[in-house]
Amino acid sequence: MYLENINGPSDVKKLTIEEMNKLAAEMRDALLKRASIHGGHFGPNFGMVEATIALHYVFESPEDKMVYDVSHQTYPHKMLTGRKDAYLYEEHYDDVSGYSNPHESEHDFFNVGHTSTSVSLACGLAKARDLKGGKGNVIAVIGDGSLSGGEAFEGLDFASELKSNLIIVVNDNDMSIAENHGGLYGNLKLLRETDGKAECNFFKAMGLDYVYVGNGNDIGALIDAFKSVKDAGKPVVVHIVTLKGKGYKPAEEDKETWHWHMPFDIKTGKPLMDFDGEDYSSVTAEYLLDKMKKDKSVVAITSATPTVMGFTADKRHEAGSQFVDVGIAEETAVALASGIAAGGGKPVYGVYSSFIQRTYDQLSQDLCINNNPATIIVYAASVYGMNDVTHLGIYDIPMISNIPNLVYLAPTTKEEYLAMLEWSIEQNEHPVAIRVPDGEMISDGKKVSKDFSELNRYEITEKGSKIAIIGLGSFYGLACKAAKEIESRTGVKATLINPYYITGIDGELLESLKADHDVVITLEDGMLDGGFGEKIARFYGNSDVKVLNYGLKKEFLDRYDVNEVLKENHLTPEQIADDLSLQ
């Protein structure tokens, strides 16, 4: 095997073109086996194998610095930079993250997981090199829809003024996670159709030199192109056309499904765990499609992650013009939603919690200052969500719940969620965000008659005394378990409260607890600092009521074990009962 003998880029440089092609085949075999067992980003990595080999053959990493956009396509890069064991041997699969990580290797320069940042980061490295009078190439690798993000445009705009070495490799596989959206991709299509010779060339218009490689899976052609731009004295774009999912037929034929994939059977391509039940994504799509048929002013918005709202290709087709994908442009999604709402439409934007960080300014300025009644559905906002350090969904409550005018809701069940969604779409007084519970969807069949227009009204779901437990959103279930544990130990039946609202407090209800409660416990599935519990603690600050806030401490977590994190933060029923006994 060639791959077993690759311990670093210097070993790649010893190979002939024929040997590199054999290496590429071995790398795909290893990637396929690993993905079938471990899951992960599939299509992007299969398409980048040859380009990665060619990059490491031509350039001198780490002296020459490579910055991968999103870095979800760095599996081949890691295989060639001393981390092959994490792809060859099952017992080492978890040795590396799914993204670039400077703690793993000197060949990685940033922790990266969000899109459209590579060109700006690479510009920074190039500027630092120039300030120090250094040499070496700086290479940004960008693709999979990342060019649709605003920061990519900003980076390209700045790059044209660098007047020093910067190489931007545009990996054009004609896909984002789903299909690409935006006028730029029409120009990429034109460039593909004309072998890069079209007069209308976006990159040249930005003031950048341009090289085209029609077969970005041809190692020889790639090596020639990279050699031609190595040590270039000004910024240049190398536009390579690759096949997403190359080498595995199911991935080549269904690029959207195979962008990221759960473990699967290699022969059939079918997932090892087949889930046919409802989840919040599928429920959202079905609800919105029904709503759209009755009301043509309802529109669903995504920023390149349509399936987070359950909008698979067939559902997008069914929705037609009432479904909008703005590309990887969260800022535009929120501003667009605000504009639609201002014009009398009923926009619903679905977004991962980790990605809503990218649009804080638009939430505050374009949406909430104008108090336009758009709906934002926030997914994977939980310790149970994505666990890579770049994709954590636990920071949303402190970040957005303190923006004036915004109403942030936290349902605990399917029924509550749909009731909140219906209210939010039909009301016209506030911008509203809904924090979708993570994990298995709970459906209790109870009809929700609550009118959410009367803001910040909590509900006592079980009346007790002495101890009150407020369980926010997905942690309401933990509140119920903690109450049972406390009662089994002390005989005290705790009062259980579903607060519904993250953005405000129910002063009347909280005041009433003072009469027969000594302790109030808050539980939230997110960061404590600046979070929901602190609002409750502040309310009781000058009283005799003791408040115990439970949530996650302020830190960056990476590839963590959920149960360990919960224990570290005393977020188990037993630990909560233990803490209470010490009061």
What do these predicted ranges mean?
Residues 19, 28-31, 42-47, 52, ...:
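Cofactor-pocket helix-loop regions in the catalytic cores of large enzyme subunits
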Residues 24, 41-162, 298, 303, ...:
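Cofactor-binding active-site loop characterized by glycine-rich and histidine/acidic residues
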Residues 29-36, 97-111, 133-139, 312-327, ...:
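Glycine/charged-rich beta-loop-alpha catalytic/anionic-binding loops adjacent to active sites
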Residues 272-274, 385-387, 407, 527, ...:
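Peripheral docking tails and interdomain loops at the edges
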Residues 108-264, 270-277, 281-286, 406-517:
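Glycine-rich ThDP/TPP pyrophosphate-binding loop and its adjacent helix/strand module
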Residues 39-48, 68-72, 101-120, 142-146, ...:
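Active-site nucleophile and cofactor-binding loops and adjacent substrate-binding regions
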Residues 248-357, 362-372, 470-473:
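Non-catalytic terminal/interface segments that mediate subunit docking, oligomerization
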Residues 86-96, 161-175, 368-380:
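A glycine-rich helix N-cap at a beta->alpha junction
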